[in-house]
């Protein structure tokens, strides 16, 4: 920005420094001051002052002696720099003062105002009840306030009854900003007010928000009525803002030309004392409509519909005519769908979708067609349901509303009785010949009605059908057949039925017009013999094949009775009807609606569209291609059967061989493979079928025109490379590295054959293994290893186990021998073993295959390694590739099956599931994290043991746990995360202590605000606490003046002391004067014990304190005593009134301590269930630099003389009943037995 200003000011200054010295540099400063003080985009002027100083110092001279030329140069410079064409500098030497602004209208008399309004406003009601209002200048608030009643009565009132409104702003070049809300408000619903714009004024440096008015004189224009705003290139200023707002509100359609891009307020200001004047926009629109980023100032308002200004009104009226017809179009569309659309289940969704569609943007028939089609397609997903525009030159032919189906049979044409003429007719329709190879050829170019075929049947049989009966295959040519009535389709299909005994279901139709569903079956009685599909039928199609010919082709393909060759058919079915929706002088709209549902024998509805052939070729090439396919099909049976035989002989999973072979034979018999037109498509279909029935993705059939080395020919002996070659290969194939922490890293991307490994073993040990064997742990990276030979796996595994005893790795079932072979580690290996105790990590990815999977699964299965990465696909230890007969078709299948040494189950099909599943790119870093974690385990166990020994409530048991914990380190050898470490540590601590309250947890960094005992809870304000108290305590006075108090958690004693007066005021006063008390602890989960003395004190008399309990604290090895308080806030309940405590199995912690104290001291009767057996409030301790935390019970009750306690065993009630019955039993006992029933001395005092 600074550079731009320097250039601009240099031009300005130089322009003022001509040889006549008429213009001083101060003019530049005056010009800048005008901009700074008045330009409504002050943010664009940053850096201008500095630029002026630099320009003044530049001393460049530009000789411009003519002031008009100078004004033009200055204007160009300013407009270019600020990118604002509204900035204009003019030279006006005869103007003593700035040109006067438009005189204030408020100074005019009422008659003058009326005359001004009549010149600036025109209104009338046009044809079609369309209101027209032309505004040439927008009056301000003062004028509208003065003349509002007149305008409403004589202008607006005449337009209120119109059906739509045209607001003509084509000649409006200005007006007052204060008039904007009035015009907008009359077009906006009155139930809400809307913020439509914010105006910034630079001279006053203020912003003014413009809102619609909550109330207006007269009525508002109906929100459901259309409004069109007309614009031209002359429309400027306030009128542009009105057009922009109404467009952004989607309240009006803007028609005409892009507006002038003016300003809300343009002022012409004198530059200093000179004769130059500066025209500057001083106000601008800030939005909010349009998000503040879209502005019309400088660029203009773009119309919704662009048209020359002089044609805008005519265009607007055409748009309104169309839009007035929209309700009728939608209603007509809905009625047609209800009456005719064949997919009845989709009609409610369509109707609902149409009812909710927004047509506010529709301004043309094209928009309407696009909108309707998008909605219909979205709701129905039926490409046949289509609205289209019919031009004025087209002549639509609408069927009668009750017309029968287009494909319904009409009156059969009368046929001549003369036999010779009938024979000639048949000869003209059908072309029959026998091609070389005894292949029949039948062409017919139209479909006749079934009744016509019935009459001509004897001639057709004799002249057409009988010559084809002895052919081995049949080619039917439908390339030139546009179809016809569908009534003959079932009859023709019946001639191709197989040897089935009964009728075959061909297809089903549902006709919406008649509401009839009809199933179509093959005819059992036919004139003449059938042509069994066992001989092979081939249909030729083209883009001209249509209607009934398409149906016939579709069904022959769907039934598996024919192979289709040629082009995709026309997709022109006779299952629809066309219904008019709208007629206008410019054309019409019509809906094509499907009236017939066509369902094939698989239950799939045919939604139109052309029939796709099995072999797609040009129509003129179809006959030659059909003969090629026919020749290929001669070998189809042998190829399919041969594939089945190979599976039976070699596939490693004999339990599924029978199923796969049976499937192949069944599909072959059904003609399912006739859709295969070459070896590629047959291979693809066979692969899909084999994988589907077996669930084995490794079964593949493929076409390879070249020769392959197949079956199990033994490979040639591996060639041993020279030492130089070997060194190069090892460095290229193996990557080794010792990572921080003595972590070895080994990557290799292929599994070599065992003999090769043995041959180069010494070099491998020297160049690779010796660098890694002494590391503390090892990562083996198989993420890029696709596998290959599995024979070296036992040798590789042996390095990670001891020599003795030998380890059973896995078993292999070999299909060729039908034997199971166990694979074991080797007793001897070259070099040093890595051993069985150091950690091993294997990295995998989805591309890791076969032998790499076998190694990883074996080491994982034997718990010797941690597998990290992605699940593998499941390869095979051995794959055989077998040629199908002598063809170029090959079958690839697993010939061996790997079985787990621990479970005996096959795993190779499922692949390897990692212990830790992460993206392959993260696997190595995760392995390093686990190594670091496992290195911490001894220290973590030591720290955990010390924390337990120093803090557990039982010092003796804590010391024993610490000692035993260090001996369990082997249980943590395969830990993979802090979460798992916490689970094992917590289980061990609870096993050693028998205490379920001694816990270990993993708490992530982002959850540490919820760790009890680590981060103190925030104490709310007194106001919030008062509401919390009301919510947390439940009180009631039951029948017979029995008090009821329930709270579900104990608070901190210090906190309760601070809010004791609130508790007394809002809780205690409600129940303190009752005759007996029920305290409900059934849902209380505990809390701090410091509040127990406060609560207990209210239920004992004033006088000597009562010892409630003694609490032993292990961290400071001390015993503290709990006593009642001598002073309490409010009144005591005393010790004479009856008191019952309700308990459940949920009652825990401090609630149990309170219950235990009141029971032991004989102050309360306990009714309910045995409590949970919790502990004193535990403490939480952080373990080293991990995210592990131990929750340790650090205190226990020691107040009972007999050493008994509730901790771990719970408090047993006096009266044991289910928790849900406890309250009823307590009320019953207090009401009926308190004064009458004599209890044992231990209970008498509190009844």
From Swiss-Prot:
Location (main, coarse): secreted
Region annotation Disordered: where it falls in the sequence: 391-413
Effect upon mutating residue 530 to H: In a colorectal cancer sample; somatic mutation
Ranges occupied by Sequence repeats: 18-320, 321-630, 631-931, 932-1230
Glycosylation sites: 205, 515
GO MF entry, a single one: retinol binding
Any one biological process term the GO annotation gives: retinoid metabolic process
Cellular localization per UniProt: Secreted, Extracellular space, Extracellular matrix, Interphotoreceptor matrix
Pfam families on file: Peptidase_S41 (PF03572), Peptidase_S41_N (PF11918)
Residue span of region 4 X approximate tandem repeats: 18-1230
Gene Ontology terms: cellular component: cone matrix sheath; extracellular region; extracellular space; extracellular vesicle
InterPro entries: ClpP/crotonase-like_dom_sf, Tail-specific_protease
Spans through the membrane: none
Residues in the signal sequence: 1-17
Keywords: Disease variant, Extracellular matrix, Glycoprotein, Repeat, Retinitis pigmentosa, Secreted, Signal, Transport, Vitamin A
Family statement: Belongs to the peptidase S41A family.
Functional description taken from the UniProt entry: IRBP shuttles 11-cis and all trans retinoids between the retinol isomerase in the pigment epithelium and the visual pigments in the photoreceptor cells of the retina.
Record disease entry: Retinitis pigmentosa 66: A retinal dystrophy belonging to the group of pigmentary retinopathies. Retinitis pigmentosa is characterized by retinal pigment deposits visible on fundus examination and primary loss of rod photoreceptor cells followed by secondary loss of cone photoreceptors. Patients typically have night vision blindness and loss of midperipheral visual field. As their condition progresses, they lose their far peripheral visual field and eventually central vision as well.
Name of the protein: Retinol-binding protein 3
Organism: Homo sapiens
